Structure formats: C-alpha cells, structure tokens
C-alpha cells in the first residue's frame, strides 16, 4: 500500500530500490516485450538495406536498423538489472519463441511501398505509445531510455512520412502502389 502511494505521488523507482515482486515482474515483462519488439523491428528493417532504391535509402535503412538494434540492447540491459533474467537468457528465449514481441513483426513485407507504409504507420503508433508510457513511467531507468528512444522514433516516423509522400506525389503508378500498400 505504501509503495502504491509512493507511485501515485509521482515516485520514481530505481533498480536497487525495494519494490514488490509483482511490480518488478510487471516492469520486467513490459521492458522485455519492448526490447524484443525493437530487435525484431531492426531485423525487419535490415532485410530492406540491399533492396532499398538508391544509396540514400540504403543508408537510411542501415541507420534505422542500427537505431532499432541499439534500442533493443539498451532495453535488454535495464531489464537485466531487474535480476529476473540475464540479457543472454532473454535473447535465447526470444530466438526459441518463448517470449513475445509486437504482432506486426510476425508479418512479411512484400514490396518497397509496403515497407514504407509499415515504417510510417508502425513508427507513428510506436511513438504515440511510447510517449504515453513515458508520461506515466515510474521506473527510472526505463523512463530515461524512453527519452532517447522517443527522439529517434520521431526521426523514423518523419522518414517514413517523407517516403510515403514522395510516392504519393510521384507518378500515377507510384501513387497507386502506395495506396494499395496503405489499404
């Protein structure tokens, strides 16, 4: 009850603070899911590095891949600080299918315009979700990392928007391809 009062008063919990196991487990599960999703998002983006049209888009896909994998590693690090699983155990669980990641990463992307649509829509949704979590986050390390992740996800969303608008205002064929991907 005192812990809930502390949280309700805007208290911030650090890794070495006393906390109920239910809180520790809930925070861990949430961060592990977020880390897994960032990792899988990076792998999805990675697949488009050689397929992206032109050097600029290839470099952009490479930079985004690095960002997503970097987010995952930061998140795995703070999840491990909760002393429920090590980083290695989390990776093994992910690769062996024992833990989860956001559903969108279960689907294959078949065309460049599909990739653009996914990049924009998923990054926009992730940004909105992460901003809401940031506002209400009581776990200090996660809140600090979210600040960085949110800044970079904003860049990713704007990049997706730029690519989507470029296709939408391109040739009739490009416009139709982009519209089909959005649909």
Where are these regions (language model features)?
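Alpha-helical scaffold segments that form or flank carboxylate-/histidine-based iron centers
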Residues: 24-34, 52-71, 115, 140-153
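Helix-loop segments that flank and shape redox-cofactor active sites
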Residues: 19-23, 41-63, 126-142
